[in-house]
Amino acid sequence: MSGYGRFAYYYDRLTENVDYGKIASWCHELIEKYSSEHEVVLDLACGTGSLSEALARLDYDVVGVDLSEQMLEEAMDKRYDSGLNIQYLMQDMTELDLYGAVDAVVCVLDSINHLENEEAVRKAFESVSKYTCDGGLFIFDVNTVYKHRKILADNAFCYDLDGLFCAWQNELGDDDSVSIYLDFFEEQEDGSYCRFSEDFTERIYSDEFLTKLTADNGFELIGKFDGFEDKPVGDDTQRMLYVCRRLNRG
């Protein structure tokens, strides 16, 4: 993945369909139901901080971690406006270095799919396990093979926004990965347009691999859901949500 550069500035405008309040409420329901502690939540791969803000409004102390400096700049601008209790850290999710344990870790919106190989996923889970308190939750999701093959595939999308045009092209690989190429055309003051590009790849990690990885890192798998609601996983599930609880180290 090349990383989010200028794309970070437009990320929220291109993802206006994402209901962060709904995601936060579902995570809150799961934490209340399955975790003994409900105070500190780590928003892993927090991006521009929209979910961090929604979680903080539910009275959590939130730590947001992301590798992109540009994304975190957008997140901190939001925090300045809202005044919410959120701490942001620029770190790699495979090498977390937090100040202490957290009660829950939330890593959603296919952030795991962005990791470049299975070893990176292993390291990320090891890091999460290290900083999740006994009885705490690890909530994460992944895009499914169905979504990559049937929804994203080789499709193209266009976004015509005020002052910005974005052409989004997907390329499905033989391994069911999807390479995503973004071309932005940004309107200048003189009416001309400046072009810039971003690209990244989302990879598929099997349910068997992820389930084993949770157990290998001291987590009990509580359940799997179709997205952000109490709905069982089906053949046409696009986003699979895993809910895991950290076993006592004892």
Regions found by a protein language model. Give the residues of each.
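Conserved class I S-adenosyl-L-methionine
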Residues: M1-A45
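A short glycine-rich, Lys/Arg-flanked "PGG" loop and its adjoining helix->strand segment in the class I
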Residues: R122-D134
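A short acidic, Gly/Pro-enriched loop at the edge of an enzyme's catalytic core
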Residues: T94-A104
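C-terminal lobe and adjacent flexible extensions of AdoMet/dcAdoMet transferase-like proteins
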Residues: T201-G250
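A short SAM/SAH-binding and catalytic strip from SAM-dependent methyltransferases
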Residues: D103-E119
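SAM-dependent methyltransferase
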Residues: E119, I139-T211
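Class I SAM-dependent methyltransferase SAM/SAH-binding core
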Residues: L42, S50-E95
